[in-house]
Regions:
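Mature catalytic core of soluble alpha/beta enzymes
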Residues: 1-391
Length: 391
């Protein structure tokens, strides 16, 4: 996409960063295009004299570390650190995948309804954080919604909708109130009704019924980026971008003199087009939407993001982008805000000033989109004027 530059920028445009647009698109095109994904295949490696990229495949998607060209003269050490960061993502997949029978999470799901299961400390911390976000988002983010996801996957294969009875049965298994932590952590995770064995280990997890399962698909990719970022930070790398799939990214420092890393925002109506560009610095970003994953039944479109409170796909939003201090938070909250809508997003962001969001509802007419900006600084945003009207 080429952003319009046929008119000289006004002072207002300049203060909003419009005068930087041509430079941002030129220097950051590849890094931004990485977020557009399959619609722009074949993907171009972002190495056009500006970056070095190292990538791997894990968690059914692509992960990449992107470094500035300042490392091009002697990239060996930075690339070793980048490789170490990507290797960790594979180890985390071996721990968290629910599609592999011997991972720690799969073993937890099989056993936790019958006995306490001790889990690795960092995984336990992630589960505690997931429970906090579940509570803070009023159940709109729920890592126990796997039974609903499995039901809808089955219905899609059978070209039908779930019955009311099927949904009701699955909903009895959904909710983090069914996941029990040790008594000593009651206050930290904010639970009111935890009553496990007082002799349980500090990182024990139990389920209160058969059929409950944890699926970290809506937070695990971001968590993997956060853990990979720890390695880069420990080595004092100050300018890099970590990308997980086409929806999650975390960035540090600046990109070749720009005030951040340019990241492309996909148009949810026309996935092959870029809706705009956001400059990301020392933050994480995640986007949730149903532009790619959906199915149709009897003429109606059903997206893949399920409201765990009702069991039905959410229809109120086209896409939601969240900026947060960590990629795990951004991942989880983009899903929660997609489900909970503008009111939840505004309420959450007002209570968590380090979190901001862009929500894109369906257009009232035509294909002109009107994003709802909750706290994202305007100087970070560069919209495609063809798709987003100027205020």
């Amino acid at each position: 996409m080429s952003l319009p530059s046929d008119q000289p920028p006004s002072r207002r445009d300049f203060l909003a960063g419009r005068a930087l647009r041509d430079e941002i698109v030129t220097v950051g095109q590849a890094a931004g295009d990485a977020m557009l994904g399959e619609a722009n295949e074949p993907r171009r490696e972002p190495t056009s004299g500006a970056t070095i990229r190292l990538a791997t495949s894990a968690m059914a998607t692509d992960f990449a570390v992107i470094l500035n060209e300042a490392h091009r003269d002697d990239p060996r050490q930075p690339l070793r650190w980048a490789s170490e960061a990507l290797d960790l993502i594979h180890l985390l997949e071996d721990q968290m995948s629910v599609y592999r029978p011997n991972t720690e999470l799969s073993q937890l799901n099989r056993a936790a309804a019958s006995r306490p299961v001790q889990v690795e400390e960092r995984l336990f911390e992630l589960l505690c954080r997931a429970r906090e976000i579940w509570r803070e988002t009023e159940g709109c983010f729920d890592p126990t919604s796997g039974p609903l996801i499995a039901l809808w996957r089955q219905c899609r294969k059978e070209v039908r909708l779930p019955t009311d009875l099927e949904l009701a049965e699955r909903l009895t298994l959904v909710g983090m109130q069914h996941v029990m932590f040790p008594r000593s952590l009651t206050l930290r995770v904010g639970s009111e009704k935890l009553s496990p064995d007082s002799e349980s280990q500090a990182t024990d997890v139990t389920f209160d019924r058969d059929g409950v399962e944890l699926n970290l698909g809506s937070i695990g990719k971001g968590y993997a980026l956060d853990r990979a970022a720890e390695i880069l930070n420990e080595q004092n790398l100050t300018e890099w971008l970590l990308q997980g799939g086409h929806s999650s990214v975390i960035a540090r420092g600046s990109h070749n003199g720009l005030p951040g890393w340019p990241v492309g925002l996909r148009n949810p109506l026309l996935p092959q087009r870029r809706l705009g560009t956001i400059l990301l610095r020392d933050q994480a970003l995640a986007t949730s939407g149903t532009a790619v994953q959906h199915f149709r039944f009897e003429g109606k479109r059903y997206g893949h993001i399920i409201d765990p409170r009702t069991g039905w796909p959410t229809e109120n939003m086209l896409s939601v982008t969240v900026l947060a201090p960590t990629a795990a938070e951004a991942d989880a909250l983009s899903t929660a805000f997609f489900v909970g809508g503008v009111e939840l997003a505004e309420r959450y962001c007002s209570n968590h000033r380090s979190v901001s969001a862009l929500l894109i509802p369906p257009p009232t007419g035509g294909q002109r989109l009107e994003p709802i900006n909750i706290g994202v600084p305007e100087e970070m945003l560069f919209w495609n004027d063809e798709d987003v009207p100027r205020p």
